[in-house]
Amino acid sequence: MERNSRIDSSGDLTQSADEDCFLDAPLLPSQKLQSVIRPHFHPVPTVCISILLALINLAYVTLAVVAFYFCLFSGKKKECNQSVAPFNLSTVLVISKLILWLLHVVNERFAHHHHCKAKNKGFLHLYRSTRHLKGLPLIIHSTGNAALLLILSVQDSISSNRQLYPCLILSVLLLELILSVICLIIYTVRIYRFNKRKPRPDIIEEEKINAYEGHVNPEIGFRHRASLEEVVEKQGDTIEYLKHHNALLSKQLLALTSNQD
């Protein structure tokens, strides 16, 4: 009994000494803690790229219409062929269309990268609401490429009708332009409004709304008008964000503590 009491007393002394060490440790400045817990807002830098891509789409279709008019309908076919030599007009059009499609691929990958970063920072609603929208222009142009290849493959079959071939190509290009520019404008407006609002992560915004309204947000659990897949997806994204945020917060706190030492 006496030995056990000595062990307990020594354990208590060790525990109290450890607690004193924690109490004597220097406190982190509140400004540094606030900067870690509430990081600065970083806008999604895809607005200018989307606007530039829409202008490139418009310029491409405009030049295609002008080229078809002067090469096929204005009687200046010889001068037009000399200006695009050693290629013909169809080859130049296909090469330009391929370059435009590659620009859409780069834009989609660029937007996807920054949307994943926004998702990791807690902007889950933005990621879900633009998940399909940011890739629609690429899908539209990929479908247009398939349509152009089909038209080019049957070019010899419709060579008897001189005006049908360019009209089909221009119809595909104009339809591509209208649909892709509409998607780009909707996406650009949505991202611009998001950057202008400078919101905090979704979880913090929901907590603020709950504290203001005084009741639990039903989206945390089950919503009557929400499907089970939406609820599971949202909860999974929330858990993933919390794990990422906790890991990042732990690293930053350890770095600040080591700097204090």
Swiss-Prot record:
Pfam families for the chain: TMEM192
Places the protein is found: Lysosome membrane; Late endosome
Gene Ontology annotations for the cellular component aspect, listed alphabetically: late endosome; lysosomal membrane
Keyword Phosphoprotein: no
Entry keyword Transmembrane: yes
Keywords (A to Z) from UniProt: Endosome, Lysosome, Membrane, Transmembrane, Transmembrane helix
Predominant location: membrane
Transmembrane segments: 51-71, 86-106, 135-155, 167-187
InterPro entries in the cross-refs: TMEM192 (IPR029399)
Entry's family note: Belongs to the TMEM192 family.
Protein name, as recorded: Transmembrane protein 192
Gene this chain is encoded by: tmem192
